[in-house]
Amino acid sequence: MFRILFLLLFIPATGLAQRTAQGELQAAAKHLANPDGTRIDFQAETIAPNDMGSSPLSSGSLILKDNQFRLSFGSITAVFDGKKTLSYYDASENTLNISHPTNAELAMINPLIILTRSEAGYRTAMLPPTKGEKVIGLTPKTANGIKQIELQVDSRDSRPTGAMITLEDGTKIVTKITGISRTKASPGLFRLMKKDYPGVEVDVY
């Protein structure tokens, strides 16, 4: 009898927590849903597992429109066409890589893709809050290289403030958002063309 009562109490509470996490994701997505485009400025670093060091904190920018994005970070420019193609230019090596990434691979480059593409492949839950922020946890339902994504949002209006991706090997990719603003994103922003990079080496995966 006690077991039945426990289950009756526990199951609705679990459902409520799930709706809360989904609601926070939907509220966060609204801050990025500008019809002409959204610009996000951020700082990011990669922390190796077992305190083996980290990359220098670097600044970058991300332009979003619908499911498309353009990432500028150091020598890297990465563009996703919103369908299936990712173009990735590395100025330090003058190489242009073209691939058809999985949703998990896209999330490693742009964790906010979770807000504009389906997160159906993840279990969502509210994690303990930090000062001034709510934290949404997303755990893959099947192995995909990511152990967990933590998305931080402002506790007042659910505006995205940062993200941390923990990979299966323990590596952490930490991103802190420093600004979100409206922008006018032209279609050409979401294409990288070989002709724009003289002498570039092109690799297609």
Residue ranges and their predicted role:
Residues 4-13:
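Sec-dependent N-terminal signal peptides
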Residues 38-44, 58-62, 67-71, 147-149, ...:
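One face of beta-strands
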Residues 47-49:
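Sequence/structural signature of outer-membrane beta-barrel proteins
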Residues 52, 76-77, 169-170:
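Solvent-exposed loop/turn segments connecting transmembrane beta-strands
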